Amino acid sequence: MRKIILASGSPRRKELLELASVPFEIIVSEVEETIGAYSSPSDIVMSLALQKASAVAEYNSDHIVLGADTIVTYESRILGKPSNEAEAKEMLQLLSGKTHEVYTGVAIIAKDKTVTFYERTEVTFWELTEEEIDAYIASKEPLDKAGSYGIQGKGSIFVQHIQGDYYSVVGLPISRLVRELKQFNIDVTHA
């Protein structure tokens, strides 16, 4: 039987697959993420997810490999993971009191088939005070997350409204993924 391999070291993606009872192993993709001249955030996340999955699939061609990538956008500006605390603060100030978009792209690669898809979710933040932002940054939580916040952690207190898939904002649209895996004859709904 073909194994499912997650090409990511993200603890959040690991937790979501476990939550859905998807059997998998982890092989972290060491690919250097490169963003080319893409026309849209959806193209970017699907391309990055495919790069990650392809790097692992190259040496695991008998198995099914999952890659994923998440970005936050606000007014056509891409907000990836902050490089330092100052950049995290700048991002949180930018998102304060506003609605932004979170895109998560997923690639599923098997020997005979490749599927890519994305989910787009709108997230609206409350107005944030400087003290709230500083305290959050001091927790270190935002430093490894796209857009400088984790909706599943302390960053949840900043969220006023969400429209779309919550789990996509966490890092993996698990409901859609489970449905897409059926194309590969993997059905975890009866597990």
Swiss-Prot record:
The record marks 12, 70, 152 as: Important for substrate specificity. It is found in: Cytoplasm. It holds the Pfam family Maf. GO terms for molecular function: dTTP diphosphatase activity; UTP diphosphatase activity. It comes from the Bacteria. The active site is at 69 (proton acceptor). InterPro entries: ITPase-like_fam (IPR029001), Maf-like (IPR003697). Belongs to the Maf family. YhdE subfamily. It comes from Bacillus cereus (strain AH187). Nucleoside triphosphate pyrophosphatase that hydrolyzes dTTP and UTP. May have a dual role in cell division arrest and in preventing the incorporation of modified nucleotides into cellular nucleic acids. It is an enzyme of class 3 (hydrolase). Gene3D superfamilies: 3.90.950.10. One of its GO terms (cellular component) is cytoplasm. This is dTTP/UTP pyrophosphatase. Its cofactor is a divalent metal cation. GO terms for biological process: nucleotide metabolic process. Its EC number is 3.6.1.9. The keyword 4Fe-4S does not apply. Keywords: Cytoplasm, Hydrolase, Nucleotide metabolism. It catalyses: dTTP + H2O = dTMP + diphosphate + H(+); UTP + H2O = UMP + diphosphate + H(+). NCBIfam families: maf (TIGR00172). The gene is maf.
